């Protein structure tokens, strides 16, 4: 077997295997990157269904995690950014503003026991909030 033939076989095998990338994408592409509407299923079991720009989550979309947690809302540069709702697998839910993937701005956490934490969040932490019992 010639070296050239062997090299071509290796290239074909790597292109089918994907060089270890086990994410699965179905949707619009531009320059071989997700761009437009599409669904990405990640190796860890999470799944994003929404808009893409230059290979990053951008616009409106939903990210569902394997444990059942889910974010629905706005994205920018691959991060939760804008208005969105995050629901943890235990039923607690945050509704409000996000910046660079963190709770930032006005929002409310609704706890599964009926209580809620409402007010301003900064850098993913409560800043000026009030806790209300059920």
Predicted regions, residues:
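N-terminal secretory signal peptides that target proteins for export/translocation
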Residues: 1-2
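Glycine/tyrosine- and acidic-biased, solvent-exposed loop/turn segments at the edges of beta-strands
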Residues: 5-6, 13-134
């Amino acid at each position: 077997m010639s070296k050239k033939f062997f090299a071509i076989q290796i290239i074909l095998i790597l292109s089918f295997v994907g060089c270890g990338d086990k994410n699965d994408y179905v949707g619009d592409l531009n320059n071989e990157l997700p761009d437009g509407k599409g669904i990405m299923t990640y190796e860890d079991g999470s799944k994003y269904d929404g808009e893409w720009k230059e290979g990053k989550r951008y616009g409106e979309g939903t990210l569902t995690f394997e444990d059942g947690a889910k974010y629905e809302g706005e994205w920018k540069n691959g991060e939760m950014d804008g208005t969105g709702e995050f629901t943890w697998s235990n039923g607690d839910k945050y509704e409000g503003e996000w910046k660079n993937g963190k709770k930032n701005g006005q929002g409310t956490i609704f706890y599964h026991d009926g209580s809620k934490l409402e007010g301003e969040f900064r850098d993913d932490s409560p800043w000026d909030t009030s806790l209300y019992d059920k």
